[in-house]
Each structure stands twice: as C-alpha cells, then as structure tokens.
From Swiss-Prot:
One of its GO terms (cellular component) is plasma membrane. It comes from Ehrlichia canis (strain Jake). One of its GO terms (biological process) is proton motive force-driven plasma membrane ATP synthesis. It comes from the Bacteria. The keyword Chaperone does not apply. It is found in: Cell inner membrane. Keywords: ATP synthesis, Cell inner membrane, Cell membrane, CF(1), Hydrogen ion transport, Ion transport, Membrane, Transport. Produces ATP from ADP in the presence of a proton gradient across the membrane. The gamma chain is believed to be important in regulating ATPase activity and the flow of protons through the CF(0) complex. One of its GO terms (molecular function) is ATP binding. The gene is atpG. F-type ATPases have 2 components, CF(1) - the catalytic core - and CF(0) - the membrane proton channel. CF(1) has five subunits: alpha(3), beta(3), gamma(1), delta(1), epsilon(1). CF(0) has three main subunits: a, b and c. This is ATP synthase gamma chain. SUPFAM superfamilies: ATP synthase (F1-ATPase), gamma subunit. InterPro entries: ATP_synth_F1_ATPase_gsu, ATP_synth_F1_gsu.
Length: 281
C-alpha cells in the first residue's frame, strides 16, 4: 500500500512538471515569433542606412569605418540569463574560448564584454582578468532604444579598440542555430544593389557619415542580439518539447508500474481472503 501511495505521488509530481514544460514551450514559441518580427524590421533599417552610406565616396567611408591595425580586440559575447535552453550557452562558450585562443596565438590583446550572465558565469574563473563588464537582465531589452541605453550603460568606449567583434548564436531556422562572429569595427558596409540616390549633406558628408556610422554599428550589434534571442527561445522551445516527450514516457511507465503494483496488491488480498476462508472450513 505504501508503494502505491509513493507511485501516486510521483505521477502527480511528473504531471505538474509536464504542465510547466508545456507552458514554457508555448511562451518560448510566442517570444520567438515576436523576435523574428523585430529581426525583420531591424534588417530593413540596416539596409536603409547602408544605402545612405553607399551613396557617398567609398574611400571616405572606408576611412570612417576602418583602422589600420587590429592589436587591441574587444569580444562582445551574447548569451542568456536563464537556463533550460539545451546546449545554447555551452555552444557560445566553447566557440568563444576557441576564438580567444586564436587571437592570443596572434599576440592580440583580448577584452571581453558579456550580454547575459550564463556565459559570464561559465568563463569568469578562467578569464576574469579580461572581463570589462557584464550586462545581465537582457530580457528587459524590448526595442532598439533600450538596446542602445543598455550598450551605453556598459561604460565601454568602443572607439578605444582596433577590432570589435560580437559573438552570438545565429538563427537560421527552428532546426539550425550555430555560433557566429560579426565584425563591428572595422566595419565593411554591405552595399545594396538598389538604385542609389544623390544626397546633399550639411555641414559635410563626412560629419554626417561619422554620425551614421555609430548607428550602423549599433544596428549590426542589435541584429546580432535579436539573432541570439531568437536562437535562445528556439532552443528553449525545443528543450521543453523534448521534456514533454520525456514526461509523457515517464507517465506511461509509472502508470504501468502502478497498475502492476495495484494488481499484485489485489491478488495478495484475494489470496489472503481465500486462505482465511479455507482455514475456517
């Protein structure tokens, strides 16, 4: 009887977990859809900035966006604040460590800026001397304005670095996300194939492009952030879907075990009743 009660408690516990994982799966799916919409809008915005930059002298644009040496490198690492998303954070940490090894083999000075706590927690003990800052609570970033404020709150001056690279999990589809690197500084503008319009700039186009360049770099970083967020939600959705399947299998096994135990208990009770009846006769 005690065994049956224990099995019932386990079944109740697994059912509770199953409800939680189902809700988390639905929430992750909804968040993924919202992030995909933001990602599409951000890419359109980036294309418009590219068109403006593309309309001016390429050599001058190159002077604004490029530096001659790449000795001092800043790696901006995108991860998450929460777990329950499969190997999402492990992949970016492994990718980052390999990237750091390659840079240090070329005698580069490497500094780290983290978006999200998970990668920071996993790398702190090994790279504490290279970490400039960590920006937790990335889920509070709801639009580009909040993202800019988030970046400025880091206190890191990107212009002090010869090379700035953002490392993130790129979202290709719901079945494919993988670690990628996007160079921010120096930045090569992807020229649009659309027809170029002629512009007149006040005071000078170099002043205008210098201002636009910061917006372009922030947009590149924002897109990387959205790609990473989409990958996180997708990974969590898949992880919760897998957890749902596992809980379903476990419930089937527990139900079978419970029925067998209950049947054995009933059989034992019947044997005792029959034995008692026969002893009376």
């Amino acid at each position: 009887m005690a065994n049956l009660k224990a099995l019932l408690l386990r079944i109740k516990s697994v059912k509770s977990i199953q409800k939680t994982t189902k809700v988390m799966q639905m929430i992750s799916a909804a968040k993924l859809h919202r992030v995909q919409q933001k990602l599409e809008n951000a890419r359109k915005h980036l294309l418009e900035i590219s068109n403006v930059i593309d309309s001016v002298d390429k050599d001058n644009v190159s002077d604004v966006f490029s530096k001659h040496k790449k000795e001092k490198v800043l790696l901006v690492i995108m991860s998450s604040d929460r777990g329950l998303c499969g190997n999402f954070n492990n992949l970016i940490v492994k990718f980052t460590k390999s990237y750091i090894e390659d840079l240090e083999s070329d005698n580069k000075e490497v500094n780290l800026l983290f978006f999200g706590k998970k990668a920071y927690d996993m790398m702190y003990s090994q790279y504490s001397d290279k970490i400039l800052n960590v920006l937790p609570d990335v889920k509070s970033i709801t639009n580009f304005l909040y993202f800019k404020l988030f970046v400025y709150s880091s206190g890191v001056n990107f212009e002090k670095f010869d090379n700035v690279i953002v490392l993130f999990n790129k979202f290709y589809s719901t079945i494919l996300q993988k670690p990628s690197a996007q160079e921010l500084i120096p930045c090569n503008v992807e020229m649009s194939v659309l027809l170029k319009e002629m512009y007149q700039y006040e005071p000078t186009y170099i002043d205008v492009i210098s201002t636009i360049s910061l917006g372009y770099i922030l947009n590149l970083m924002y897109i990387a952030f959205l790609e990473n967020s989409a990958s996180e939600h997708c990974s969590r959705m898949i992880a919760m879907e897998s957890a749902n399947r596992n809980t379903k299998d476990m419930l089937n096994k527990l139900a079978l075990e419970y029925n067998r135990s209950r049947q054995a208990s009933i059989t034992t009770d019947l044997i005792e009743i029959i034995s008692g009846f026969e002893s009376l006769n």
